[in-house]
Amino acid sequence: MDHAPERFDATPPAGEPDRPALGVLELTSIARGITVADAALKRAPSLLLMSRPVSSGKHLLMMRGQVAEVEESMIAAREIAGAGSGALLDELELPYAHEQLWRFLDAPVVADAWEEDTESVIIVETATVCAAIDSADAALKTAPVVLRDMRLAIGIAGKAFFTLTGELADVEAAAEVVRERCGARLLELACIARPVDELRGRLFF
């Protein structure tokens, strides 16, 4: 591409309440994950979205709340997780998480139909949940694309994937941001400019 994609301003407009912040931790130990969740919630009144074992024996923890609350909870979580101990696989703190993310974070949802669209699609597969959420958030804040599907860890060996649709130039801009944010955590990124009719709107049968 000729230039870096323009990044949308994710900061809420003046006078409007903050969008919820999001904190995510992936741990290699289920027992450590539970103690991390306990410490995080005792430190600040964040709302616990998820604290559960997932595929490959990992523990996944998600919290939301005001920015200051999530910051404090994440500080406590890191202290108990033990930086450098090997228990903390990945972490993510998003002060202003994009609004399209939230409905995909608690449990798998049925993706919206897009059979009638002529949109292009990218499929992103990552090694960690944090990488998927972080890169999807960045892509959504960079280009006018739509998050169609997101699956996190359960039933897919602890990996994560998501799909984005939009005009070809927009999904290509989103893909550039995804690659940058994921780095070595990106397992695969595929772009289909014009999905075949049998797959359009339902990539997974």
UniProtKB/Swiss-Prot annotation:
A Gene Ontology term for the protein's cellular component: bacterial microcompartment
Record SUPFAM superfamilies: CcmK-like
Main location per the UniProt record: other
Ranges for domain BMC: 21-106, 120-204
Gene3D superfamilies for the chain: 3.30.70.1710
Result of knocking out the encoding gene: Required for efficient BMC formation; when deleted from an artificial operon (Hoch_5815, Hoch_5812, Hoch_3341, Hoch_5816, Hoch_4425, Hoch_4426, Hoch_5814) being expressed in E.coli, a >10-fold decrease in BMC shells is seen.
Chain spans, region Disordered: 1-20
Alphabetic keyword roster: Bacterial microcompartment
Pfam families (alphabetical): BMC (PF00936)
Compartment(s) of residence: Bacterial microcompartment
Result, substituting S55C: Binds a 4Fe-4S cluster, exposed on the concave face
Practical applications according to UniProt: Artificial BMCs can be made in E.coli by expressing (Hoch_5815, Hoch_5812, Hoch_3341, Hoch_5816, Hoch_4425, Hoch_4426, Hoch_5814) or (BMC-H (Hoch_5815), BMC-P (Hoch_5814), and 3 BMC-T (Hoch_5812, Hoch_5816, Hoch_3341)). Cargo proteins can be targeted to this BMC. BMC-H can be modified to place its N- and C-terminii in the interior of the shell (called CPH). Fusing proteins to the C-terminus of CPH allows targeting of cargo proteins to the lumen of the organelle composed of CPH, BMC-P and BMC-T1.
Entry similarity comment: Belongs to the bacterial microcompartments protein family.
Free-text comment on this protein's domains from its UniProt entry: These proteins have 2 BMC domains which evolve independently of each other, giving the term pseudohexamer to the trimerized subunit. Although the homotrimer fills the approximate space of a BMC hexamer protein, the BMC-T trimers are more compact. Their universal presence in BMCs indicates their structural importance. The homohexamers form pores of at least 5 Angstroms in diameter.
Binding partners and assembly: Homotrimerizes to form a pseudohexamer. Unlike its paralogs BMC-T2 and BMC-T3, the pseudohexamers do not stack. The concave side faces outward, with the N- and C-terminii exposed to the cytoplasm.
Annotated protein name in UniProt: Bacterial microcompartment protein trimer-1
